[in-house]
Amino acid sequence: MNHATSELHDESAVSIVPETTRLQDLSALVKMGIVNSNTLTVFTGFWLALHFNGLSVMDNLDKLFFTIVGSALIMAGVCCLNNYIDRDIDPLMERTKNRPTVTGKYKPGFALAFGLVILLLGFVFLLLTTPMAVLISFIGAFTYVVLYTLWTKRKYTLNTVVGSISGAVPPLIGWAAIDPSLNHPIAWMLFLIMFIWQIPHFLALAMKRVDEYRNAGIPMLPVVQGFDITKRQIMIWTVCLLPLPFYMSGLGITFMVIATLLNIGWIALGLYGFRQQDDIKWSVKMFVYSLNYLTILFVSMIVVTFF
């Protein structure tokens, strides 16, 4: 449930709608890229809950199926609702101007109905695991659709922080499907990692797309406060990730070393280019690093449990 950002600059020419298949349109409607990336964090939470509770994945294949399918449907549902709500500003932004709710491939009513149906279906699937998993997923969905998309996205620079709450719950959903008590510290470290990671990730993207956000009237931090303050905020949040691996000693020294090196690498990259290159180039490097960071970190959490 990680939150998706959207963009574009003014164009005087009439936009040409690209030819797309029905599958491509559906993928854009539910934002499959977001669903796929968040599914990794759901699975990681599920896997680590099994590991620390001494359970076998083979004995919990049914719960794994319900958890992955349920959480994926919920994420797809809230993304549909996001497309429905943002259909008035999506034409103003480059990455979203060809979404099916903008081009007319899907009518707004369909996007709304389809989003609600698969959202509810996702809750049903998760109900076959634990009520806590349903509760956490509801909190994530409510935060993304209501608190982020409907309320803060168009009004406050804190929209990034609010959206990061919803993006941080997927690993907790996975964990709660196995261990609804959520009393293991690593479960909450997963939440904190995802919450903190999203802020420099999306602020870097906002720097890259600053003109498009400005034209669309979305008050992202670089639009309102400029690049200098945004860069400082990116560095502050990146540094906040540094101590977290040391609260995850249960995963072993190998993981702690990998995570610490990833954190140091991100900080070093930010400091190295902080005043030595143009701001857009810096933001692109920070954004790309953040993507690789998250994938390597969460895959590492799974791999180290085999040794």
From Swiss-Prot:
Biological processes, Gene Ontology terms: heme O biosynthetic process
EC number(s) recorded for this UniProt protein: 2.5.1.141
Molecular function per GO: protoheme IX farnesyltransferase activity
Predominant location category: membrane
Enzyme class: transferase
Reactions mediated catalytically: heme b + (2E,6E)-farnesyl diphosphate + H2O = Fe(II)-heme o + diphosphate
Keyword vocabulary terms for this entry: Cell membrane, Heme biosynthesis, Membrane, Transferase, Transmembrane, Transmembrane helix
GO cellular component: plasma membrane
Pfam families named among the record's database cross-references: UbiA
Quaternary organization: Interacts with CtaA.
UniProt pathway: Porphyrin-containing compound metabolism; heme O biosynthesis; heme O from protoheme: step 1/1
Similarity comment text for this entry: Belongs to the UbiA prenyltransferase family. Protoheme IX farnesyltransferase subfamily.
UniProt entry tagged with the keyword Transmembrane: yes
InterPro entries: Protohaem_IX_farnesylTrfase (IPR006369), UbiA_prenyltransferase (IPR000537), UbiA_prenylTrfase_CS (IPR030470), UbiA_sf (IPR044878)
Protein function: Converts heme B (protoheme IX) to heme O by substitution of the vinyl group on carbon 2 of heme B porphyrin ring with a hydroxyethyl farnesyl side group.
Membrane-topology annotation of the record: Multi-pass membrane protein
Localization per Swiss-Prot or TrEMBL: Cell membrane
Organism: Bacillus mycoides (strain KBAB4) (Bacillus weihenstephanensis)
PANTHER family: PROTOHEME IX FARNESYLTRANSFERASE, MITOCHONDRIAL
TM spans (from-to): 32-52, 65-85, 108-128, 131-151, 158-178, 186-206, 251-271, 287-307
Further comment: Carbon 2 of the heme B porphyrin ring is defined according to the Fischer nomenclature.
Name of the protein this chain belongs to: Protoheme IX farnesyltransferase
Gene giving rise to this polypeptide: ctaB
